Design a protein with these regions (language model features):
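C-terminal binding/interaction regions
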Residues: 18
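Short, structured patches in soluble enzyme cores that scaffold and shape functional sites
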Residues: 22-26
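Glycine-rich phosphate/nucleotide-binding loop
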Residues: 65-69, 73-176
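Single conserved hydrophobic/aromatic residue that forms the stacking wall/gate
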Residues: 1-8, 12
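Accessory alpha-helical/coil subdomains and C-terminal extensions
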Residues: 27-67, 121, 167-173
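Arginine/glycine-rich "motif VI" loop of SF2 helicases in the C-terminal RecA-like domain
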Residues: 10-15, 99
Length: 176
């Protein structure tokens, strides 16, 4: 039930009145499949009670306009894997560029600490573990292609949710 999304977002983000955005193929109301359109209408009906931004596109996810992205697992997984692929592509291009000349190699040597900080910051293994909200239990879905570091981070997410009585907080918030 989309109307409970804000309550789920409140608890998960530990933030009062988080901004919700609904992932869609466009920001126009005529775009999207029937499920997305119906979810939009459901969220719009309760928008006085929630902070509903409206439709967001894939390129809006990381702009900071929304705190919680409402999506189905299929579209969400595509968005996530696309972002990971773009990050890998950027690093491949950078690596090839730095190998192109002696000056580039020196530039790489000088900028390596900054590049490593950036790479660490966007490492998808660090954020591994998609929380499936709205279930009567803790479910954290790990990326199938991760390594031990990423898998441990997904387990840490699950442990944190358990330690913080996540399910009880959700039940209180949305009054199941």
């Amino acid at each position: 039930d989309a109307s409970k999304s804000r309550g789920l977002g409140d608890v998960y983000k530990r933030q009062k009145n988080p901004v919700l955005g609904l992932l869609n193929v466009g920001s126009e109301h005529i775009k999207g499949n029937s499920v997305v359109k119906q979810t939009f209408e459901d969220l719009k009906k309760i928008s006085p009670k929630i902070n509903f931004y409206g439709f967001i596109e894939g390129n809006d996810i990381n702009k900071g306009n929304v705190d919680v992205v409402v999506t189905d697992g299929f579209s969400g997984n595509i968005a996530l894997k696309t972002a990971e692929g773009v990050a890998e592509l950027i690093f491949t291009f950078l690596k090839n560029s730095y190998k192109s000349s002696l000056v580039s190699k020196i530039g790489y040597f000088l900028s390596k600490p900054a590049i490593n900080r950036f790479k660490t910051r966007i490492d998808p293994r660090k954020y591994n573990g998609a929380v499936l909200l709205g279930l009567n239990g803790i479910v954290v879905k790990s990326h199938g292609g991760t390594d031990a570091f990423g898998f441990c981070n997904a387990i840490s997410v699950a442990v944190s949710l358990i330690e913080n009585s996540y399910i009880n907080e959700i039940e209180k918030k949305i009054k199941i």
